[in-house]
UniProtKB/Swiss-Prot annotation:
Subcellular location: Cell membrane
Protein name, per record: Hypersensitive-induced response protein 3
Entry keyword annotation includes Cell membrane: yes
Lipidation (N-myristoyl glycine): G2
């Protein structure tokens, strides 16, 4: 701003305050303004109408006794029609704004637990903005926006919170892993059950085919060889199967088969036991 031939230049987005012998005269708008110094007029100071930002750090304690540092960002500007109030009524507007911010934050945060402070930071910012706007408008300042840009707990508390979050994530991961293993085991059991069912069907069909073949063999042999009975044919078939079994067991060195008495007479004894068991079952039914 210059002062030449009783004229001053007020820059764009600024206003100047003119006084005469120490008394307020008027607010000078941007442009070339006439200030006759010969009659005691002079420019007492200037104010910017630009948007200004003030970051305020406030340390306080939550309801659950955790110390936190809350950082609030205040965006404000001077009201052009109240520039004289902004110039004369406040000697240090930033100090006044900080005082209101401290007052509101320290009134709101102690009512909330730490987790609630993070969740309700927008409500805290709104409370600060409403209180500031109500107070600062009378002094010629407009509060445009208030933001809570950071909430910083004590370092030990922050470390504990990180450990709690890590433990919670590990619990979730362990639960998901256990659920996956459970599904795998269920599917494996279902597969084994289906496999055993199909294997049982195959064994049943195999045994049915064996029974049908034996029946046909017994009937055919008894019909073609006079003097033989069905019992004689069954004894001969069982003896043949016995020797086949002995051959299969001896073919491997790691057989886990249960070995029953192997004398030739034992086959007849086993056959007799089977027949007696069948007869007893038929009589009982």
């Amino acid at each position: 701003m210059g002062n030449l031939f009783c004229c001053v230049l007020v820059k764009q987005s600024d206003v100047a305050v003119k006084e005469r012998f120490g008394k307020f005269q008027k607010v000078l708008n941007p442009g070339l303004q006439f200030v006759p110094w010969v009659i005691g007029d002079y420019v007492a100071g200037t104010l910017t109408l630009r948007l200004q930002q003030l970051d305020v750090q406030c340390e306080t304690k939550t309801k659950d006794n955790v110390f936190v540092t809350v950082v609030a960002s205040i965006q404000y500007r001077v009201l052009a029609d109240k520039a004289s109030d902004a110039f004369y009524r406040l000697s240090n507007p930033t100090t006044q704004i900080k005082a209101y911010v401290f007052d509101v934050i320290r009134a709101c945060v102690p009512k909330l637990n730490l987790d609630d402070v993070f969740e309700q930071k927008n409500e805290i910012a709104k409370s600060v903005e409403e209180e500031l706007d109500k107070a600062m408008t009378a002094y010629g300042y407009e509060i445009l926006q208030t933001l809570i840009i950071d909430i910083e707990p004590d370092q030990q508390v922050k470390r504990a919170m990180n450990e709690i979050n890590a433990a919670a994530r590990m619990r979730v991961a362990a639960s998901e892993k256990a659920e996956a293993e459970k599904i795998i085991q269920i599917k494996r059991a279902e597969g084994e059950a289906e496999s055993k069912y199909l294997s049982g069907l195959g064994i049943a069909r195999q045994r049915q085919a064996i029974v049908d073949g034996l029946r046909d063999s017994v009937l055919g042999f008894a019909g073609n060889v006079p003097g033989t009975s069905a019992k004689d044919v069954l004894d001969m078939v069982m003896m043949t199967q016995y020797f086949d079994t002995m051959r299969d067991i001896g073919a491997t060195s790691k057989s886990s088969a249960v070995f029953i008495p192997h004398g030739p007479g034992a086959v007849s004894d086993v056959a007799a036991q089977i027949r007696n068991g069948l007869l007893q079952a038929n009589n009982a039914s």
